[in-house]
């Protein structure tokens, strides 16, 4: 008996499915959201497919059930009706409350099923859900810098598949590995480690992004034990580490942590490697000096170690093809016995012959010692005997150190006026010798709105510039020192300078500032200083002459003492330094005429004529030695010569010769250079760059400028230029043998020069000084702009006189 069919409610699974579908269309998602809409449509299609499968199963059951009607047919019909109602409501974009839907399902009248069997519905294919497209994952592993992904289509059992393979980028390597994401990168790393000696940490260094693209700073490299050992010993040289650093426990552990099998040896082996590195760099420098086309200017100086060992330091200077000033230390020898002129000359000549540059010398800069005078005389004779072809028979060879001259002049002047600054020395010593008194001074400085971090320098007997620095700092803290005296008169009244003494200190400070600025300017080694000597020394001479008639007696006494020493060295100064000033297009001959008229009065023309003869003699020497010396013919006449060679008419040929002789203009680079107006330039001026751009216009004068401007007017760097006690070799190196000391100092200088501008390596002899002195030079230039204007006015007056007009 068939049970009655009524309004049966839908099954629980259908209700849960309907609730899930309704929640996907909650009121909070009424805004058009494509993602959730696609998801709801997918659930709808799955529900319809499930309902269709249920109907098929029930139909098959009825077909095998002897014509009995399934009691659940009405239930299936109600479920199908319920799903259609929910789908229609979702399609209309309306939200349905799940509780209301349940009530509607319960009370909705259901149609009565008929007893006849229902036709079996055809099974509907289940629609496939469209999967959202995924963004391709970016390869972040460093192995892909050495492999390239390629897609390969393969066929398996009649079906085609796409496989991804990674091919090695190294030349002549055909290795490839599966590159799908689930395969990983271990195989790639193992291949790089075993076949190409690349391990983790060496594959790629940090990269930077430029316009969205990764740019590697360096390329992968193969580990080289020889290169690593060279870097280690180069670090010992450049940073002046002790040799036994290779035996330090924690340093060895550090190296072993980087590479356990690194062959770090003992200090004896380190010394051997350093000597080998020195010989290697020496051979490179020898080949480089062989190709230099210009002449060399040299400096020779004596150094002292803590064990009183004397060393001779010989440095060569030249201007390369790019018109950059170069310098190299070519000798650092231990000189035994007395430093006689003969011994010094023999050592210097041996060094020049050793480097094969004895025939390319131009000048030698030395200190003002009696032994050096004898040494220079012997060196010139030795070089002439070897046919070294010295310029003008050595007339420009000996150059006296300008900084040493200024040092001697300043010391003689300070020795006379030492008593006038005794109180300043006393009060500076008082506040610096006690921390409590220094704190009191700094408290007074704060009350006067002064910079407490500036500090006060103290006077040192062997450094004349320390007196200048002490006066500068004391004058800066003058308000604080006066305030300190007022707060404790019992302690400071006797040692604090009076108002008149402060005025005297200010006057001395202004006088010494001229010496300080010029010494700092002429001590540079990174720029040409030869063209700055003549103008600077003329300014000093002019100032000393003015101080000799100063209203204050103390200044006059100081000026007289300075004048005696200055005149002694001014008379024997090298004429080549005046030539260097002549080669400065801002001054030429006009500046020399200006100062000669100022110093010699009406007889200045005699001195100017002597100077011009020296210039012409130097020009003739280079003209005779230059294989490419220009001829005194114009370009038009040269083209005429070519025409004459091709012309067979003798009469016409003679006529052309007559025309050429008639309008031929004898041209001379020297006369052309002197006839051109002065270069108007303010601020810093790069004289080497200026001559570099005039090579085609003045081929002979540029050769002269290239040799003359390489002259060093100082034998020391700025940090030791003010010392009267000489230079001292580093105490950590003085126990080493002279051979290894030379290797360390020379190699450091050569390597640092080859890396010029990349890294600064502090050195014991100051070979790589910073160009801070250029700022002082610019300030000094501004202070003397009036004199430069006088020189230009003097030039204009001369031109007016030459043209027949009155000034």
Swiss-Prot record:
Record keywords, A-Z: DNA recombination, DNA-binding, Repeat, Transposable element, Transposition
Disordered: annotated span: 42-140, 785-807
Bias (Polar residues) ranges: 84-98
Record's keyword annotation contains DNA-binding: yes
Region called 10 X 2 AA tandem repeats of P-[QE], residue ranges: 109-128
Pfam family, one: Dimer_Tnp_hAT
Sequence repeats: 109-110, 111-112, 113-114, 115-116, 117-118, 119-120, 121-122, 123-124, 125-126, 127-128
Transmembrane segments: none
GO molecular function: DNA binding; protein dimerization activity
GO biological process: DNA recombination; transposition
Stretches with biased composition (Pro residues): 110-125
Note from the entry: This protein is coded by the transposable maize controlling element 'Activator' (Ac), which is able to activate chromosome breakage at a specific location; it may be the structural gene for a trans-acting function required for transposition.
Protein name: Putative AC transposase
Organism name: Zea mays
